[in-house]
């Protein structure tokens, strides 16, 4: 009888751990990765964004992390949402992006600092004769605002599936 009880408890614990692990894996994937690039004149910038998995009512995702380079200068970090990059006050950032052919970022845009101590705010300007993307670049002694072309695309990640016995099935692409 004790052996049967032990077996039942160990199976129950295994099932509980399996479901807890499945929930952890599901939450671990609750971010979206994007490839992004922009260029204009002598500016070339590219890298990756990490965003929330959830979209707001306008279809925007919140950017939570950025990596990449601007003209070979490594990006150090994402500038905080709700703040302005130094030299571009009072224009605050919202760090939002969406899947769209035009105006993927807002008029507030996203901002970052570089390893050499410069700051960048890339945004969509709807006040131009022809609406488009712009980059504000600031250093300790300079300020520039130039038009750029911008594109970001979510990275398609393989989906891991298992059959009822827990055996991993071949990956599918979303």
What kind of region is each of these model predictions?
Residues 2-15:
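Bacterial N-terminal signal peptides that target proteins for export
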Residues 3-6, 22, 162:
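Intrinsically disordered, low-complexity Ser/Thr- and Pro-rich stretches
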Residues 9, 18, 35-36:
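Generic detector of short alpha-helix boundary/capping microenvironments
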Residues 13-14, 22, 39:
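Residues at the start of alpha-helices and the adjacent loop-to-helix junctions
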Residues 16-18, 28:
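Cleavable N-terminal signal peptides
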Residues 31-172:
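Mature extracellular "passenger" or substrate-interacting domains of secreted, surface-exposed proteins
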């Amino acid at each position: 009888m004790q052996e049967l009880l032990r077996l039942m408890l160990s199976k129950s614990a295994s099932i509980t751990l399996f479901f807890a692990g499945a929930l952890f894996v599901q939450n671990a994937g609750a971010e979206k990765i994007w490839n992004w690039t922009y260029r204009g004149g002598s500016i070339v910038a590219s890298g990756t964004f990490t965003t929330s998995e959830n979209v707001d009512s306008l279809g925007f995702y919140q950017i939570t992390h950025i990596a990449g380079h601007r003209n070979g200068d490594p990006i150090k970090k994402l500038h905080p949402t709700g703040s302005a990059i130094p030299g571009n006050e009072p224009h605050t950032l919202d760090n939002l992006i969406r899947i769209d052919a035009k105006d993927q970022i807002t008029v507030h845009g996203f901002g970052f600092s570089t390893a050499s101590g410069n700051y960048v705010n890339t945004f969509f300007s709807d006040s131009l004769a022809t609406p488009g993307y712009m980059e504000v670049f600031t250093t300790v002694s300079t300020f520039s605002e130039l038009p750029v072309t911008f594109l970001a695309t979510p990275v398609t990640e393989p989906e891991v599936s298992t059959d009822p016995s827990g055996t991993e099935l071949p990956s599918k692409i979303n």
